[in-house]
Amino acid sequence: MNKKDTCEIFCYDEEKVNRIQGDLKTIDIVSVAQMLKAIADENRAKITYALCQDEELCVCDIANIIGITVANASHHLRTLHKQGIVRYRKEGKLAFYSLDDEHIRQIMMIVLEHKKEVNVNV
């Protein structure tokens, strides 16, 4: 077992632990985790990236861009919508999707930039 990345003795900073535990009780970390989990799916990450590149895309465009069926794209878009990542508007029989706000674009761009800086293999 590689012990280079772990403490060799058990001790902790009680003040830091108590402060951060208190902070965690005041935020909705479960919702944050659910939002990040939604984007963590490969197809949903591709959809999010596509919507970073163009302000608004219809479901058919998205399906073609990432190479899945319209039904599958709709399923992924519903998941993203439920998590507040995308919004949509109807125009006749077409549904157009966009990112919910600039924060989502920033998150995606920051993660992409970070990926360039670190050597992480999946």
Curated annotation (Swiss-Prot):
Residues 59-78 bind DNA. Keywords: Cadmium, Cadmium resistance, DNA-binding, Metal-binding, Plasmid, Transcription, Transcription regulation. GO terms for molecular function: DNA binding; DNA-binding transcription factor activity; metal ion binding. SMART domains: HTH_ARSR. Cd(2+) binds at residues 7, 11, 58, 60. Homodimer. GO terms for biological process: response to cadmium ion. InterPro entries: ArsR-like_HTH, ArsR_HTH, HTH_ArsR_DNA-bd_dom, Metal_resp_trans_reg, WH-like_DNA-bd_sf, WH_DNA-bd_sf. Pfam families: HTH_5 (PF01022). Residues 24-119 form the HTH arsR-type domain. It comes from the Bacteria. It comes from Alkalihalophilus pseudofirmus (strain ATCC BAA-2126 / JCM 17055 / OF4). This is Cadmium resistance transcriptional regulatory protein CadC. Disulfide bonds: none annotated. Metal-binding repressor for the cad operon. Involved in resistance to heavy metals, such as cadmium, bismuth, zinc or lead. Metal binding causes the repressor to dissociate from the DNA.
